[in-house]
Amino acid sequence: MRIAGIILAGGQGRRMGREKALVPLSGVPLIARVLALAPQVEAVAISANGDPGRFGLGLPVLPDRPGESGLGPMAGIRAGLDWAAGIGAEALVSTATDTPFLPEDLVERLAAAAPAHAQSFGRDHYTAALWRVATVPRIDALFAADERRIARLSGGAVAVPFDTTPDPFANLNTPEDLARAEDRLRQNAP
């Protein structure tokens, strides 16, 4: 199965006080840390609105489709699925830009259970998921019904457990979360 990847970077970053994708963690922007996903997929794009040049990573930056701007991660996944289909991929793995500790076997394990989303310690992580390109009509139907909850989209998907400590899907929403992540990196430094 040909698999593409998308980094969901469309959030406003209100609690962080700035755009999370560009927040440095030990001197490296969060989005660059999440880009470690790249070797696991055939191609990677970024889902974000606004100036695509701000990322400076040389990757395609996919805005939400007209009429779907600001509708949350499902809009980014929808744009990513169009892009994935256009490059000949059969599936798309999505990840959030504020999850810098993703497992090195994320794509492999999600693909083995496809369609699937990650789960850690009983908590579902619907933005860390593998979506088949054939999911597009379901997303369109949910949008038509004014449904934006990504959990609804993943109905029927397998929850793949990643129960390692520390949590590989810990997301960074606040400056306090960022400080904890800095501590985590310091503790794991050689």
UniProtKB/Swiss-Prot annotation:
One of its GO terms (cellular component) is cytoplasm. CDD domains: MobA (cd02503). InterPro entries: MobA-like_NTP_Trfase, Molybde_CF_guanTrfase, Nucleotide-diphossugar_trans. Mg(2+) binds at residue 98. Its EC number is 2.7.7.77. Keywords: Cytoplasm, GTP-binding, Magnesium, Metal-binding, Molybdenum cofactor biosynthesis, Nucleotide-binding, Transferase. GTP binds at residues 8-10, 20, 64, 98. The N-terminal domain determines nucleotide recognition and specific binding, while the C-terminal domain determines the specific binding to the target protein. This is Molybdenum cofactor guanylyltransferase. The gene is mobA.
